[in-house]
Amino acid sequence: MIVDDIYKNNDKKILIKRNMRSRGILSMRSSIMNFNLNKKIGIIAEFKRRSPSGFVNNENTDIFKYYDVIHNSIAGMSILTEERYFNGNQMDVVSVQRYNIPILIKDFVSNDEMIESSYMIGGDVILLIADFLERDKIEMLNRKIKSLGMEALIEFHDLKAFERITTDENVIIGYNRRNLKTLKIEDESFDAQDLIRSTGLLSVLESGITSENILKMPRYNAMLIGSSILSNDSVLKSAGMIKYDGFGYS
């Protein structure tokens, strides 16, 4: 399995260990809440070159031009840094710091060294995936994240994995519609929404969101969208038409 292989080889990753951070930490939570207060959903736009699910970025390969097109519509950016399967590059994060927008490090983080490196390249939020990490491990990793003043996006797909999520004040909870074990979209976003709502934390819906289905999605504070935006789908325009009132979309 691809994701298992990535985790198994994390100790072999070549990480940037020189401090290349050029600004303070920016809060993704605050950025999303500001959008919500203005009756908008927060959009986290993803930059990636390819993914094992079959996506190849042929349209928006220049991350600077990509940002110029989307920056007025987004609450933050998600940048893939995993190299082997996603062609990610840590230097993308270093470069995007100049825009003063919250940056989510999209990788399969499993140790303190990866968190420290993510901080040094300019990341603000660390992704932790509950489907592949035990609760004790998540708690340990988030202690490190908090010690650096960063936030954590803790995502799950399997509803049973939800109980592994720590509900600390620096946490955002994400529901990934994609099963990372099969790479298929298996949507239980309405049930997941109820679980997340019980924590009182901000929620993010992830994967397979397009201009055709975004209006049918349940209420989340934010949506993480990659392939559709990168493929020049009109999903950002559709998202801008949605009124977020704190209880649902209209």
From Swiss-Prot:
InterPro entries: Aldolase_TIM, Indole-3-glycerol_P_synth, Indole-3-glycerol_P_synth_dom, Indole-3-GlycerolPSynthase_CS, RibuloseP-bd_barrel
Molecular function GO terms recorded: indole-3-glycerol-phosphate synthase activity; phosphoribosylanthranilate isomerase activity
Catalytic activity: 1-(2-carboxyphenylamino)-1-deoxy-D-ribulose 5-phosphate + H(+) = (1S,2R)-1-C-(indol-3-yl)glycerol 3-phosphate + CO2 + H2O
UniProt-listed Gene3D superfamilies: Aldolase class I
CDD domains documented for this protein: IGPS
EC number(s) recorded for this UniProt protein: 4.1.1.48
Pathway assigned to this chain's UniProt record: Amino-acid biosynthesis; L-tryptophan biosynthesis; L-tryptophan from chorismate: step 4/5
A family per Pfam: IGPS
Entry superkingdom: Archaea
Disulfide cysteine pairs (residue numbers): none
EC top class named in words: lyase
Keywords: Amino-acid biosynthesis, Aromatic amino acid biosynthesis, Decarboxylase, Lyase, Tryptophan biosynthesis
Any GO BP annotation: L-tryptophan biosynthetic process
Family: Belongs to the TrpC family.
Protein name: Indole-3-glycerol phosphate synthase
Species assigned in the record: Picrophilus torridus (strain ATCC 700027 / DSM 9790 / JCM 10055 / NBRC 100828 / KAW 2/3)
Lineage: Archaea, Methanobacteriati, Thermoplasmatota, Thermoplasmata, Thermoplasmatales
Designated gene of the protein: trpC
